[in-house]
Amino acid sequence: MKKRIDYLSNKQNKYSIRRFTVGTTSVIVGATILFGIGNHQAQASEQSNDTTQSSKNNASADSEKNNTIETPQLNTTANDTSDISANTNSANVDSTAKTMSTQTSNTTTTEPASTNETPQPTAIKDQATAAKMQDQTVPQEANSQVDNKTTNDANNIATNSELKNPQTLDLPQSSPQTISNAQGTSKPSVRTRAVRSLAVAEPVVNAADAKGTNVNDKVTASDFKLEKTAFDPNQSGNTFMAANFKVTGQVKSGDYFTAKLPDSVTGNGDVDYSNSNNTMPIADIKSTNGDVVAKATYDILTKTYTFVFTDYVNDKENINGQFSLPLFTDRAKAPKSGTYDANINIADEMFDNKITYNYSSPIAGIDKPNGANISSQIIGVDTASGQNTYKQTVFVNPKQRVLGNTWVYIKGYQDKIEESSGKVSATDTKLRIFEVNDTSKLSDSYYADPNDSNLKEVTGEFKDKISYKYDNVASINFGDINKTYVVLVEGHYDNTGKNLKTQVIQENIDPATGKDYSIFGWNNENVVRYGGGSADGDSAVNPVDPTPGPPVDPEPEPEPTPDPEPSPEPEPEPTPDPEPSPEPDPDSDSDSDSGSDSDSGSDSDSDSDSDSDSDSDSNSDSESDSDSDSDSDSDSDSDSDSDSDSDSDSDSESDSDSDSDSDSDSDSDSDSDSDSDSNSDSDSDSDSDSDSDSDSDSDSDSESDSDSDSDSDSDSDSDSDSDSDSDSDSDSDSDSDSESDSESDSDSDSESDSDSDPDSESDSDSDSDSDSDSDSDSESDSDSESDSDSDSDSDSDSDSRVTPPNNEQKAPSNPKGEVNHSNKASKQHQTDALPETGDKSENTNATLFDAMVALLGSLLLFRKRKQDHKEKA
């Protein structure tokens, strides 16, 4: 069976297509599936200074049809939507009475150069959501922003299918992706909790080094506000802080003031600046004329904002303005849901706050005992250094279930390879795998510390279990597992400007039954967009305040009184972004949550024909106790020629143990031609006292033809439970051993005086009946249905009682899924005894009679020879 890890949208061949509307955009979602996964994606983005956030949850009921993958109608519910538009850092400057020439000479305008055009957001077609883009008009310069939009498409379709070889993959890139099987079709789903996009952001010149004087003592902050104090960071949630500031007295170029964040909060979100000197550029504070009043940066390590005044402020005083900055969770310092202190220091003045993080759970999957469960999160994207790296955390089996034949696929795309900038390959991707000791200690934020004692690195054990044979896909064979694993991904994306889309998939079966194929998937996407902002710093011009904060006082009053409450503007209709000169402020918080599920069960039926040839090996254990006293006078001359031909073909198994203690005196001349394999171990205790003088002339010709029927009775108790799936023809040759135990007690007393010259001819036809009793106890694991037709021939020449030992028979492991036909056949054979074909009583009498005649003849012969010996003496 071939499975595929993709699906293409808008393919109506044999798949149902549903139309639904999210926000103001209508999109079509087609559920053609690679790997059996119906991806239902969403978009999200984050803003640094100008941010729009919307959250939508979509859910659907389970649906299933034979060999048809249908995506149910999604019921779209718009949740609380808050839009913060055009948050702009601004300043208003009151100047002292100076000449215009002086003011002009001390005033400069600094604008960062921009050489690249602003990347336009890549349209995400045929998805479950459409991101709204805010149209912002900036007078002179646009600063980068990160739009946050989150959509949750929960489309759970659980299917029990009977699929063979679920790990087989096929990854064509151009044809519709399907997954089907003659015995069932899997219809999983993908949950997309948060989607982000990533466009290459051109590095922005950082703020000037703070070489001047710290003027925190001259800066007063007021009207501090948090946009919200509770949100879900795993659903692209974040908040904004807004405050007014006023500079008392005069400052000069190079002077600066600071703002510091607490441990539980960050200003960069999930954008990684570790390759950019851990410094993130912040939008400049500008005047209405576009003059840069102050340049700002954010230090990732110290969580400190630094606002450095430019020479614009020289010879000016009473500068006042405002700023609004996005705040995100610190996944390492706030790993669990809860309320954290968020006390923010602005210009050495503390503003006490508390923020509640309501992380959506990373433990997600199919709600069945053997259901696949996996989730992932992009926790860091380098947008500034040009190295184009990202970091991703994957939780494998977070529900800690017992799963069989588990495979995990980490993809650098979702629907189509050409629609993502992700690069997954042996050279572009580094994987580290950890075994989790205590699943309850996993973070809600997807943060995983490699040095955590709760994580045991087992990457070396997967050296030969990681492959990249499919384009842009890493395949990991976890096999049979009952523990949770964390996979840390260090990947790359290209410079095409496309969104970074990733997908993780887990598939497995129920190890107890070998059926119930289950699959679950998870989507992530990152987008960094560009926005703009403006500010005012010239006292001669009334500022325009596009931000939802307190307005800047346009008049040069010594005590400006700003409005106490920021009021956000109405949400604009989604229109394409203009192409401003980008000064990126890529603050993004990357989180996503997606899942796909499917279940399938398989049952196999096989017919088998079996031919068996058996070769018997008989082992006889005889014990006789003979006490004879004879006085015989005979003269015999015996010439015996015996030709014996025995052929035994028996289906039995025996072990023989014999101990022989024999005290005998015999003289025999025999010629035998025997085609049999016999191992005889006799235990005989014979005490014979014979005084025989015999003279006999005997000519005997004997022909013996024996035919034996073997009657075996076996009792077999087998318990089988197996994972088998095949059609097989088997031929078997069996060697059997028999164990016979015979005991005879003979007491004869004879006295004879004979002189004979006999000429005897005997024709002997013996029929022996062998009774074998075998007790076999076998235990095996098998779950199969098979019809077995076996034909065996057994022909044995033996006079024995066979008691084979207990045989423990165990069904062999069946890695390829073939049905073990021997279980059922052997069980039937062991419980049905062979029919009796001989007459036991007659055979026994004939045997005793032959033994007595042979004994009498030997006594007469012995006596005759003894007598001849005496006469010669």
From Swiss-Prot:
Residues 44-192, 530-845 are annotated as: Disordered. A motif (LPXTG sorting signal) lies at residues 834-838. Residues 96-119 have a biased composition (Low complexity). A motif (MIDAS-like motif) lies at residues 272-276. The modification Pentaglycyl murein peptidoglycan amidated threonine is found at T837. The record marks S197, L198, A199, V200 as: Cleavage. Residues 838-873 form a propeptide. Residues 554-797 have a biased composition (Acidic residues). Proteolytically cleaved by aureolysin (aur). This cleavage leads to the inactivation of ClfB. It comes from the Bacteria. Residues 45-542 are annotated as: Ligand binding A region. InterPro entries: Adhesin_Fg-bd_dom_2, Adhesion_dom_sf, Fibrogen-bd_dom1, LPXTG_anchor, SDr-like, SDR_Ig, YSIRK_signal_dom. Belongs to the serine-aspartate repeat-containing protein (SDr) family. This is Clumping factor B. It comes from Staphylococcus aureus (strain MRSA252). The lineage of its organism: Bacteria, Bacillati, Bacillota, Bacilli, Bacillales.
